[in-house]
């Protein structure tokens, strides 16, 4: 029996790739645990680490550690025997939801996104029932799909979610620009939730300023289906190809409609992007302090 060390370098939710690593090694009889640092490195036969973001600091790891994730290389892949393994929740005993992909890939080629490079064109990945394997998951499902409606089984999967009365979080967001009436109507029948499963939220994105007309049309479709603006959260990308004025216009347009903007800085080290994101995303400050007053106090 080998001893396997696991290290999650970033990310706020359980790491599915590391869960597959754990699942594979547990299946062949290995002992899997969290890696405890260089002082204990010699006790492990193999060490795996995952890094999702390039800006995350890299700790010192043994030379033979297997390091993967988009923060290291867009194109790296799990070995087939690990990719095909059933994820193990043993690393995350407090995880109280089911986690997985119903599809992978993306139909779009946004210049700021690595998904098309890493996953390619959309393809179906798992059925809803295949994802429901967490013994502590209850009726909570978190889907990691980057282009949910790009999968050919999107309708069957939504109907299954509705049938099973699952609370579902589309954590990567949905594309409201091309949302159809049928899709909006089925979403309205879902018990859609936020990341903590304690509020009714559907997450979309307004990344490009010029998509404003499409965003408004998508919001109207949601309203027509019975989804109120108060249930709509929008990722708002800043610092890529928009001006501060365009950032403010998108945020205030959404806020004035009763939707919830959530700013995503393209460059977290940029002073303006960091401050603007903090101002918008801290709801109490956003509602009570003007940007002109806040930005001067953060200089």
Language-model region placement:
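Flexible, charged surface loops at secondary-structure boundaries
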Residues: 1, 38-45, 59-62, 93-94, ...
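A short, structured N-terminal alpha-helical element that caps or precedes a catalytic domain
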Residues: 1-67, 72-75
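Core AdoMet radical
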Residues: 6-7, 11, 48-49, 115-219, ...
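Canonical Radical SAM [4Fe-4S] cluster-binding loop centered on the CxxxCxxC motif
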Residues: 17, 94-131
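Anion (oxyanion) recognition and catalysis
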Residues: 26, 162, 223, 255-256
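Ser/Thr/Gly-rich flexible loops in soluble cytosolic domains mediating phosphotransfer, phosphorylation
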Residues: 66-92
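Flexible glycine/acidic-rich beta-alpha junction loops that bind and position SAM and/or redox cofactors
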Residues: 238-244, 262-299
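Catalytic cores of alpha/beta
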Residues: 241-258
């Amino acid at each position: 029996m080998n001893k396997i060390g696991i290290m999650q370098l970033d990310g706020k939710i359980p790491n599915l790739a590391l869960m597959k690593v754990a699942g594979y090694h547990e299946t062949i009889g290995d002992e899997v645990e969290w890696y405890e640092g260089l002082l204990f490195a010699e006790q492990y036969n193999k060490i795996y680490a995952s890094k999702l973001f390039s800006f995350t600091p890299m700790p010192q790891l043994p030379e033979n550690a297997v390091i993967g994730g988009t923060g290291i290389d867009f194109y790296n892949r799990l070995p087939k025997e690990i990719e095909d393994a059933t994820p193990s929740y043993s690393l995350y005993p407090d995880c109280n939801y089911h986690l997985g992909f119903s599809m992978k890939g993306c139909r779009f080629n946004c210049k700021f996104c690595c998904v098309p490079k890493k996953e390619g064109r959309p393809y179906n990945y798992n059925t809803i029932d295949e994802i429901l394997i967490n013994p502590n998951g209850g009726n909570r499902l978190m889907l990691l799909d980057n282009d949910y409606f790009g999968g050919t089984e999107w309708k069957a999967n939504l109907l299954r979610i509705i049938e099973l009365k699952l609370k579902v979080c589309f954590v990567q967001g949905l594309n409201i620009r091309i949302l159809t009436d049928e899709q909006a109507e089925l979403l309205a029948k879902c018990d859609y939730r936020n990341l903590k499963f304690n509020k009714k939220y559907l997450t979309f994105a307004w990344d490009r300023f010029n998509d404003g007309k499409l965003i408004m049309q998508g919001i109207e479709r949601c309203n027509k289906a019975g989804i109120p603006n108060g249930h709509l959260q929008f990722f708002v990308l800043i610092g890529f190809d928009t001006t501060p004025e365009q950032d403010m216009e998108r945020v205030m347009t959404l806020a004035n409609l009763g939707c919830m903007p959530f700013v995503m800085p393209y460059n977290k080290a940029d002073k303006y992007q960091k401050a603007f994101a903090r101002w918008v995303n801290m709801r109490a400050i956003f509602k009570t302090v003007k940007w002109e007053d806040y930005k001067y106090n953060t200089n």
